[in-house]
Design a protein with these regions (language model features):
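C-terminal alpha-helical "lid/dimerization" subdomain adjacent to the S-adenosyl-L-methionine
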Residues: 149-198, 203-205
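A short glycine-rich, Lys/Arg-flanked "PGG" loop and its adjoining helix->strand segment in the class I
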Residues: 129-140
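Conserved beta-strand signature within the Rossmann-like core of class I S-adenosyl-L-methionine
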Residues: 141-148
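Class I SAM-dependent methyltransferase SAM/SAH-binding core
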Residues: 47, 55-104
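Conserved alpha-helix/loop element of class I SAM-dependent methyltransferases that forms part
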Residues: 25-44
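Conserved glycine-rich SAM-binding loop
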Residues: 52
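N-terminal, positively charged/glycine-rich alpha-helical extensions of SAM-dependent methyltransferases
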Residues: 1-18
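A conserved beta-strand element that flanks and buttresses the S-adenosyl-L-methionine
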Residues: 116
Length: 219
């Protein structure tokens, strides 16, 4: 099926709460565990683009107490929930939250040792926005670790994934999940994007619905 761009970012309070209360612990912990295993000494100054309710960055901060993380999201409702979660975890000194969109967030060029993102790319109407920002804000040889949904072959395939993964979740979350699957890119499309952006990253499917884009920027 062709890509169907999502109607809006998750800035509705009901959507944000449904997403924050959903159980993404398995995929979020997988992401953190593999990031740390793949790049154990490269995580010092980290940025998470599209941080959502901050579950990933909280898990990373607990795993790597020496890391400082700048976490960015464009949805005010999501940043509010992220702030509550970071405060409850006692990690305010380790995690800085910023509400804003890319491009536009005032981040200095070549600032970060590692650039992370999980389940954010598919929200963007133009994916090159993300790849250009990655090149701009990463230091030479910075780690890039991005995990996102990939688009199923048909809408029916997307519905099967929704029912398998989110059968017990709220209807609003299931609708958002279906829309996200339809808005996601295929691994081949992402490879084309990376070539256009001159980014030397690899793309690998890691589950029935997720792909992992990883590597380092040029030194």
């Amino acid at each position: 099926m062709e890509r169907i761009i999502e109607p809006e970012l998750m800035d509705d309070d009901r959507q944000a709460r449904a997403y924050a209360h959903a159980d993404f612990s398995t995929s979020n912990q997988w992401f953190v565990d593999h990031l740390v295993a793949d790049f154990p000494t490269a995580l010092r100054s980290v940025v998470d683009l599209g941080c959502g309710p901050a579950d990933v960055v909280i898990r990373l901060a607990r795993t790597k107490p020496g890391v400082h993380i700048t976490a960015i999201d464009g949805a005010a409702a999501m940043i509010a929930m992220a702030r509550d979660a970071v405060q409850a975890a006692g990690l305010e000194q380790q995690i800085t939250l910023i509400e804003g969109y890319i491009p536009g967030v005032p981040l200095a060029d070549h600032t970060f040792d590692a650039i992370l993102s999980k389940d954010f790319l598919h929200h963007l109407p133009d994916p090159m926005i993300l790849w250009h920002e990655v090149r701009r804000i990463g230091k030479p040889s910075a780690v890039v670790y991005i995990m996102d949904l990939f688009r199923p072959a048909t809408p029916d395939d997307a519905r099967v994934i929704v029912e398998r993964v989110a059968a017990g979740e709220a209807p609003i979350l299931k609708t958002d999940f279906f829309n996200s699957l339809c808005a996601a890119f295929t691994p081949t499309e992402v490879e084309d994007q990376l070539r256009a952006a001159s980014l030397p990253l690899t793309v690998e499917p890691v589950s029935e619905r997720h792909m992992l884009i990883k590597g380092r920027l040029a030194g």
